[in-house]
């Protein structure tokens, strides 16, 4: 059983067919622009999604024109999140799926259910890749008061990684962490010397993925295992993808991501977060 009340026509946001189809078109525009700009007009091999309502929405995304003649596998299940939103992963069929799992976050100190972490182990060109798609608990109530929730998730994920991955495999941890690269849930509890946070790097492209009260930073991050810097894989680029059409300027001249909603008011934008990406290639 899932909670989809937020996405119905009689909800506070008054979702309807027009708004839904418009949102699909906006997502298509962003993904298409990213493919053109960053990947020679090819769609990404892996696409992580956050705040997805259900499998039907994913199918509708894959039915947009940019995905025609593309063959993606879907990794998703309905999560127990109180808002009815899930994480998902789209994978091109050239990858072989060895294992998939949905890591349940059951914090006894938190009475609000949250999203599962999506995990998949893939094989491609005789290499093993571990992919984790995250959407950690929000800062509702303040960063400090809610910090224990994200620390709990970080510990769950770190333990899972230690039990289900090995040092000769390539690991990618991505998503909306609702914390910044310098917060302790990331630095103290998740990270170690086996990982590199691409958004805590001088080479990162962009000033952030999210603007909170006029300050840009990285709630959305991609963390990779340090062996991505070995001789067989070359890291090409990474950062937040942004185009002018994805942004708006407020009355004070501050630039923000152009969002779909502000509270319950429909603005018809794209998202209050910018998409993040990283690109690598195999070296023969």
Role assignments for model-derived ranges:
Residues 46-48, 52-129, 136:
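Structured beta-strand-rich core segments of catalytic domains in phosphoester-bond hydrolases
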Residues 1-65, 75-79, 85, 252-254, ...:
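N-terminal, active-site-proximal structural segment of metallo-dependent hydrolase catalytic domains
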Residues 159-171, 178-284:
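Metal-dependent phosphoester-hydrolase catalytic domains
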Residues 127, 133-146:
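Active-site His/acidic residue clusters
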Residues 52, 136, 176-177, 274:
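Active-site metal-binding loops of divalent metal-dependent hydrolases
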Residues 9-20, 43-49, 76-77, 107, ...:
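Second-shell loop/turn segments in exported
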């Amino acid at each position: 059983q899932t909670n989809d009340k937020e996405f119905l026509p009689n909800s506070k946001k008054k979702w309807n067919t027009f708004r839904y189809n418009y949102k699909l078109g906006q997502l298509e525009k962003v993904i298409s622009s990213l493919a053109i700009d960053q990947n020679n007009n090819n769609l990404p091999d892996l696409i992580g999604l956050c705040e997805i309502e259900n499998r039907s929405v994913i199918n509708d995304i894959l039915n947009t024109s940019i995905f025609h003649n593309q063959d993606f596998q879907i990794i998703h299940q309905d999560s127990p999140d109180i808002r009815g939103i899930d994480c998902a992963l789209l994978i091109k069929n050239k990858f072989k799926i060895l294992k998939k799992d949905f890591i349940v976050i059951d914090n006894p100190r938190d009475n609000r259910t949250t999203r599962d972490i999506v995990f998949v182990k893939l094989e491609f060109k005789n290499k093993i890749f571990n992919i984790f798609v995250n959407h950690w608990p929000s800062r509702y109530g303040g960063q400090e008061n809610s910090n224990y929730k994200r620390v709990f998730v970080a510990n769950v994920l770190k333990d899972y990684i230690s039990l289900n991955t090995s040092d000769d495999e390539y690991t990618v941890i991505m998503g909306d962490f609702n914390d910044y690269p310098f917060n302790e849930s990331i630095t103290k509890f998740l990270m170690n010397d086996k990982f590199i946070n691409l958004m805590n790097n001088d080479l990162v492209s962009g000033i952030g993925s999210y603007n909170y009260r006029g300050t840009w930073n990285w709630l959305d991050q991609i963390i990779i295992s340090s062996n991505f810097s070995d001789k067989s894989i070359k890291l090409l680029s990474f950062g937040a993808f942004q185009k002018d059409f994805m942004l708006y300027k407020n009355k004070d001249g501050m630039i923000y991501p152009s969002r779909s909603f502000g509270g319950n008011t429909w603005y018809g934008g794209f998202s209050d977060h910018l998409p993040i990406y990283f690109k690598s290639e195999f070296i023969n």
